Amino acid sequence: MISVKNISKSYKSVRALSGFSYDFERGIYAILGPNGSGKSTLMNIMTGNLKADGGTVTVGEGGEMPDYMFGYCPQYPGMYPNFTAYEMLDYIGILKNAENREKQIERFIEIFELGEYKNKRVGALSGGTKQRLAIAQAFMGAPELVILDEPTAGLDPLQRINVKNFLAEQGKKTAIIVSTHIVSDVENIAHEVIMLKKGKITLGGSLADVLSRVDGKCFTASAEHISQNFEGIYRLCGADMRIVADKLPFEGAKLVSPELEDVYLSVFGMGDDI
C-alpha cells in the first residue's frame, strides 16, 4: 500500500494542495479536476520530482518508496531524441533492473503497436507515438505503482481504447493513478475516483459510491424532442431533471443511470474543463 498523508504545497500565495490524504492499493485510481486543481502537483510530489511543504508519502509500514517501485508517464514526457524507441525501453528496463527485459520490451511493442517504430529515433516520432512509448516506459520493470498524467493526450480514439483496455488488465496487479481531463478514459475501469478542487478532495471513493452521489436518475432527450425553451440541454440529473420533466414529451425522454461525467459536472459545474 502507498499512503499519502496530509500533503500540502503552495506556490507563493497560491495553495496548490491542502492536506491531501489517501491510501492507494492495487487497482485504478482516477484523479479528476479542472485546470489548477492540484493534480499535477500531487503527482510530481509522489514521484519525488517536487518537494512538498508538509506531509509524507510512504510504502507499507512507513518506508520510503524506492525508484524502481514506481513508473511515471508525465504530461509532457521527456526522452532522449537520438535513442530509438527500442533503446528507450531498454534503457528504462536497465535502470529498473527489470527481469526478462527483452521479453517485456517485445510485449509492450506489440501491445502499443510500436513495431514499425522500434528502430526509429525518438526525435523523429509523432506526438502520439511518443505518448504510447511513454506509457510503455512507465510499466517497464513491473512497478508496484504507476502514475500517469494525462496519458492519452495526443492519441486517436482507437489508441485511447487500446490504452484503456491495457490499463484495465494491469489494474488487477498494480496500483495505477491516472490524472485526465477525458472522463471516458477512466469510466468503467476506475476502481476509485478522486475529484480535486483547489487542492482539496471534493469527492472520493469507489466508482459506485461516487456515481451514487448524483441525486437520483438522469433524463436524456434527443434534440428533436427538446422544446425551444431548453435548446442545447440533452442530459439532466437530480433536481434539474424534476424541474423540466413535465415539459418534455414522454416519448422524447428516458431515465438512465448517471455517468461519471454527470458527477463531474455536478461537482465542478458546466464551466470547468472535463
Where in this protein do the model-derived segments appear?
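Helix-to-loop junction immediately C-terminal to a conserved catalytic motif
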Residues: 47
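Conserved ABC transporter NBD signature motif
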Residues: 54-68
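Conserved ABC ATPase "signature" region
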Residues: 90, 100-117
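Conserved ABC ATPase signature
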Residues: 121-125
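Catalytic Walker B motif of ABC-type/P-loop ATPase nucleotide-binding domains
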Residues: 146-150, 155
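ABC transporter nucleotide-binding domain
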Residues: 162-244
